[in-house]
Amino acid sequence: MENFKHLPEPFRIRVIEPVKRTTREYREQAMLKSGMNPFLLDSEDIFIDLLTDSGTGAVTQDMQAAMLRGDEAYSGSRSYYALAKAVKDIFGYEYTIPTHQGRGAEQIYIPVLIAKREREKGLDRSKMVVFSNYFFDTTQGHSQINGATVRNVYIKEAFDTTAKHPFKGNFDLEKLEKGIQEAGAHNVPYIVCTITCNSAGGQPVSIANLKGMYEIARKYDIPVIMDSARFAENAYFVQQREEAYKDWTIEQITYESYRYADGLAMSAKKDAMVPMGGILAFKDKSMEEVYHECRTLCVVQEGFPTYGGLEGGAMERLAVGLHDGMRQEWLAYRIAQIEYLVAGLEKIGVPCQQPGGHAAFVDAGKLLPHIPADQFPAQALSCELYKVAGIRAVEIGSFLLGRDPKTGKQLPCPAELLRLTIPRATYTQTHMDFIIEAFQKVKENAENIKGLTFTYEPKVLRHFTARLKEVE
């Protein structure tokens, strides 16, 4: 299939879900009813849903078939051992705990690592700081409700949508080490490496950067947890962009990457392609105590440690999905779909972040320069996109970032982005063309789009349930 300008989707569509078309008037009323928050829209009112790629895509026939093997035993399920074997084979990690999704893993490991640091190193909870290349929203939320100050240490190119860099998800290693020294290593219970880096635009982290980060972590005896939702996409970018690994397989790159962490927390609803599921895993004997403490907490919060909130069939499906999500031709198609969408948007003058994995990220701050950050330009753009075309997207900016839990002040956000998240094996090139045409219509009316202000603001993870209105 070489030398073709464009290759179609590398799969056949066997089952379809009908969607309804709505009028502009209907969508305007739906948006008002939702409090100008697309999270609160009903899915039946969405024509193209780009809110997230988390559990919203198709599954493979092998994944669906695997569910028939499910062992629903309460403890010691053979389906658990199938999942644990997949984790060992792919990542090299000895200890596996299934969870219902990624935040289930976070609510377990975060308090355990904090308590361990306090017990062994004398951590002062009032001075506790945790670091990441950029925390995902729920990881940030769980860290904050456990009393930690979160610090994102990213490279200067990360949020410059005009800059080109092969690995915009990288840690700024100098800032990381300086931050640890300023906080005191004993007050840093963990470092989280997010791959790919969602908030920066699905941007990858190089293996060279992983090595440097892990060397710093080892120097100060700080455990590293890999936030692994998009581990396969990151491996694909390493293969395509990091010279030393151009001849490695996705499987080889993945295994190598996870040498530079002590544990992983995964929302398996992304690259593992399942509609529900998560994983918490630890590398070796050095993390055995943490593993056992997490198992105990799992019983209270998720379920018995050999099912962790998942039925046996779901664990079987996840074990297969971990492998299916790493297929070379699948990843090449998926990234090409993002690149096609970004190129089309930029061609009509819509500014975007450099193409990464899983989504196109529109620079709403540049598209709507008349709306200040505290009136959430990307959220306003999201509302307008829905009203124009029935497309639901998600804000990745000041609205999502939220307030400092100690001062109550809005946290400064490096960019105001609108994420157009592409569910796996769900939308075709025709859908991408429709999205581009919709943005052309939005752009024509951009100067008339109004900023937003709160009518209801939750204290934690406000972007999920907040309600807003237009600023008059």
Swiss-Prot record:
SUPFAM superfamilies: PLP-dependent transferases (SSF53383)
Class in the EC hierarchy, top level: lyase
N6-(pyridoxal phosphate)lysine: residues bearing it: 270
Cofactor: pyridoxal 5'-phosphate
Pathways involved: Amino-acid degradation; L-tryptophan degradation via pyruvate pathway; indole and pyruvate from L-tryptophan: step 1/1
InterPro entries according to UniProt: ArAA_b-elim_lyase/Thr_aldolase, Beta-eliminating_lyase, PyrdxlP-dep_Trfase, PyrdxlP-dep_Trfase_major, PyrdxlP-dep_Trfase_small, TNase, Tryptophanase_CS
Enzyme Commission no: 4.1.99.1
Single GO term (MF): tryptophanase activity
Pfam entry (one): Beta_elim_lyase
Superkingdom, taxonomy of origin: Bacteria
Catalytic reaction equation(s): L-tryptophan + H2O = indole + pyruvate + NH4(+)
Protein keywords: Lyase, Pyridoxal phosphate, Tryptophan catabolism
HAMAP family: Tryptophanase
Family matches, as NCBIfam families: PRK13238.1, tnaA_trp_ase
Family: Belongs to the beta-eliminating lyase family.
Oligomeric form and interacting partners: Homotetramer.
Protein name per the record: Tryptophanase
Organism: Haemophilus influenzae (strain 86-028NP)
Gene coding for it: tnaA
